[in-house]
Amino acid sequence: MALLNLFFCLVFSSPLMAMPPVLQGRKSMSPDSILKDTSTDDGARDFQGRKFPQFMMQLYQNIIRGRDKDLSNLEHPTLQESDTVQSFITKSYTTVGNHWTLFFDMSSISRSNELKLAELRFSLPSFRKSHSVTVDIYHTNDGKEKLFMGSFKTKPSAALDADCKVFNLTILLQNFLTRGKRLIKDEYIQAKGLHLKDLEKSATEKGTENVDTLKQDQYHVSDFAAERIMLVVFAKEQSHAKSDPPSLGKKLFPSKYGIDDNANKVNGFRRLRRNKKEKTQIHVSTGPPKPIEEIKPKCKKVDMFVDFQKIGWGSWIVYPKAYNAYRCESTCAVPLNETENATNHSYIKSLLPLSDMERKECPSCVPVKMMSMSMLYYENEDFILRHHEEMIVEECGFKDM
């Protein structure tokens, strides 16, 4: 996959066009201010004592700004279909000559999601200068078990002169997650002098050996900037998995916002009660006719600001720290008028006299159109950028109770 690697490492354009730039607002809450306030000496970003890759913050910035012009014809439609971006920082890595072995904990990858794209991102100078490299990928859980997932060979020094090398591991990861098979593949550049059968034989040996017994120089993640070796996974929640609550729903207890009962009580039509004298009297008005009072919609959208820090979720939500979710509010007038967003049934019911109904109900003023929002947060020791549906009220209208 042809990429402008330097561009992707420094200014990643918006891949998820379904994510609208809905976070408006305060200068103190801008993504730029977060990057500035949380910078550390090694280039990583600090959040609640945890380091997270600058790439994820830059990706989030570009998503909410709607930048997508520089995406290639291949990445644009693929990334547009994703609703989750998950980053995995390497737990450790080993090198023996030009043979690199990387260890990731990918326990949090859900098999119920459809994998769209998996990128391995390198920004180590020693890797960029290598002429011919074989890279092995392992899954490890707390360092106790090491499971070989696949391998690829490449020639970093022959690629574009970029500070960050990006490799497409989509097939490798898909093959392992869906079939449990290891994959040895040339993703980008053929390395001269290496044969596929030799790699397959080596991979078979790797699947059964204990990597710790090899005489290798092992470096841990604490010895270098967190984002220098990272696996980024783009995924889409499948339709059959929609019945399960999303990750945000599993973490949060949804708040219920009710409408004031006093505002919803209906007294019915005002009926003019005239006595016998009033029926026989004729009133003549000499003044100008009174203008008909404009009937305004009774169901409207009002502000509802959510501060994640105040409700106890600030410890794991990186951005946004706060946003306007809006809510619907009404005074429930009958009969309904044509300016109010209601069903035909609501219109008819509002016109019936009180005597014809056992109970006069007020149509509920509820959201009829919702907007999505992108969120960057910490989950299962990984940083995730996820697109959550129905987070912001866009339009309100009447519906039957």
From Swiss-Prot:
GO terms for biological process: gastrulation. InterPro entries: Cystine-knot_cytokine, TGF-b_C, TGF-b_propeptide, TGF-beta-rel. It is found in: Secreted. Pfam families: TGF_beta (PF00019), TGFb_propeptide (PF00688). Residues 1-18 form the signal peptide. GO terms for molecular function: cytokine activity; growth factor activity. Gene3D superfamilies: 2.60.120.970, Cystine-knot cytokines. Expressed in the dorsal marginal region of late blastula, becoming restricted to the dorsal blastopore lip (Spemann organizer) at the early gastrula stage. Glycans are attached at residues 168, 337, 341, 344. Residues 19-274 form a propeptide. Disulfide bonds join 299-365, 328-396. GO terms for cellular component: extracellular space. Keywords: Cleavage on pair of basic residues, Developmental protein, Disulfide bond, Gastrulation, Glycoprotein, Growth factor, Secreted, Signal. Exhibits mesoderm-dorsalizing activity and neural-inducing activity, but lacks mesoderm-inducing activity. Regulates the expression of specific mesodermal and neural genes. Induces convergent extension movements at the embryonic midline by activating the fgf signaling pathway to induce t/bra expression in the organizer region. Acts with wnt11 to induce Spemann organizer cells and induce axis formation. The unprocessed protein antagonizes bmp-signaling. Belongs to the TGF-beta family. The propeptide region is both necessary and sufficient for bmp-inhibitory activity. The propeptide region and the N- and C-terminal thirds of the mature protein are necessary for neural induction activity. Although cleavage doesn't appear essential for activity, residues surrounding the cleavage site are necessary for activity. Monomer. The propeptide region interacts with bmp4 in a non-covalent manner. This is Nodal homolog 3-B.
